[in-house]
Regions:
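Polybasic low-complexity intrinsically disordered regions
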Residues: 1-50, 64
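A short, flexible helix-boundary coil/loop motif
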Residues: 104, 108-109, 133-168
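Generic, well-ordered alpha-helical scaffold segments in large soluble proteins
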Residues: 10, 35-42, 97-100, 104, ...
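Helix-centered, glycine/charged polyanion-binding patches within enzymatic domains
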Residues: 44-120
Length: 168
């Protein structure tokens, strides 16, 4: 809808953990820090932070700006492990998510006014995608599966690093 929107999703389940609109047509590498910051803020209740970001080649050279996150892209082919090489192939999983946001969740056109409206629209489209994802999982796994997750204390749940796939 005229601005660049960055999407961050989890490694498993492709749940969107960050959606941010960037105005002024910025370079991809200059948007990564803000995108990771938003994903960290939105996941603060889960005590998990993005540890690794699998990105495309537009994010080359931003390793020094983000020392807390390991940035993996195709340009580092000789320096990445075999596991990271396999996970890098999964980076393409963000493309269908972006397609669904544009086609099914009305991200193709924003009817809200101004920069604030664009930012709000991106987050609301991502929230709609996540609600649809959650309803699909409830239908697939059953209501009792999710009810257990809400009543189990947070200290007993296993937590690990969240891998973010960043795409535009």
């Amino acid at each position: 809808f005229g601005v660049k929107v960055g999407i961050a999703s989890t490694f498993r389940g492709n749940l969107i953990v960050g959606a941010r609109a960037f105005h002024g047509n910025p370079y991809d590498g200059h948007t990564l820090n803000e995108q990771l910051e938003q994903a960290t803020i939105l996941m603060q209740d889960s005590a998990a932070k993005p540890a690794t970001a699998f990105v495309d080649l537009g994010y080359r050279g931003v390793d020094a700006d983000n020392p807390q996150v390991r940035i993996v892209h195709r340009g580092k082919a000789k320096r990445i492990s075999e596991q990271e090489r396999r996970l890098l192939k999964r980076r393409q999983a963000i493309e269908p998510i972006i397609g669904h946001l544009k086609a099914d969740h009305r991200m193709d056109r924003c009817h809200l006014k101004g920069e604030r409206g664009d930012r709000l629209h991106a987050v609301l489209c991502a929230a709609g995608y996540n609600i649809k994802w959650l309803l699909r999982m409830i239908a697939k796994k059953g209501v009792t599966f999710f009810a257990i997750g809400f009543f189990v204390p947070a200290t007993s749940q296993r937590r690990g690093p969240v891998l973010a796939y960043i795409g535009h």
